[in-house]
């Protein structure tokens, strides 16, 4: 974008012969069209954070020149944080793999909106089997996820192949600040629920416990991270 603006400014500031000017105008128009196409195909969002940017990775059949289009998702400001506020993450991982090898494969960023039996429903309205698509990850309402799916040509339907968290982080020695029944909070920043939390056998988090956790990005009330695994370090 900055390069295109610089070229436009330079074009209007200098004098050129008519032939060069015509060629330059054509080149600038092509660049601008390419940029608009890239933004139009790749960018998009859902209001109220109900779902994340749709189709931020384009499929192999949408291309400009020889290179497939790629773009980073336009995340809400609260979600762009690399780790929970005020905490130092040991690692923060973007759980994005390389482009799917099959041309019919798609990548969708969305949020989990409801859990019904063994099927989950996301912001774009299709369900998937927890056992088949989620592997070691157990999604929860509000989790931001990346869904890899294929279009069934014979049925015109979508089949989810893999569901994983959009981003996760590892944090050491964080404190349980409060608990309320089956839910609780770490460092007043990270939400957790015993309904979807991996714990050592026999351990139940209590206030002031010091723990190591793995957290995923999740849109909960007042919180943007959810603990999915917890190991006690110091129990009071």
From Swiss-Prot:
Expression sites by tissue: Expressed in spermatozoa (at protein level).
Knockout mutant characteristics: Knockout mice do not exhibit any gross abnormalities and survive to adulthood. Homozygous females are fertile, while the numbers of both litters and pups progressively decrease in hemizygous males over time. Males are totally infertile around 32 weeks of age.
Coiled-coil ranges from the UniProt annotation: none
GO CC, alphabetical: acrosomal vesicle; cytoplasm; sperm flagellum
GO BP term, pick one: spermatogenesis
Positions of transmembrane segments: none
Recorded superkingdom: Eukaryota
Region (Disordered): 57-84
Subcellular location per the Swiss-Prot or TrEMBL entry: Cytoplasm; Cytoplasmic vesicle, Secretory vesicle, Acrosome; Cell projection, Cilium, Flagellum
Keywords: Cell projection, Cilium, Cytoplasm, Cytoplasmic vesicle, Developmental protein, Flagellum
Chief place where the protein resides: cytoplasm
Cysteine-cysteine disulfides: none
Function statement: Plays a role in spermatogenesis, possibly acting in the regulation of the autophagy pathway.
Assembly, per entry: Interacts with GABARAP; this interaction may be important for GABARAP protein stability. Interacts with LAMP2; this interaction may be important for LAMP2 protein stability.
UniProt name for this protein: Cancer/testis antigen 55
Organism name: Mus musculus
Primary gene name: Ct55
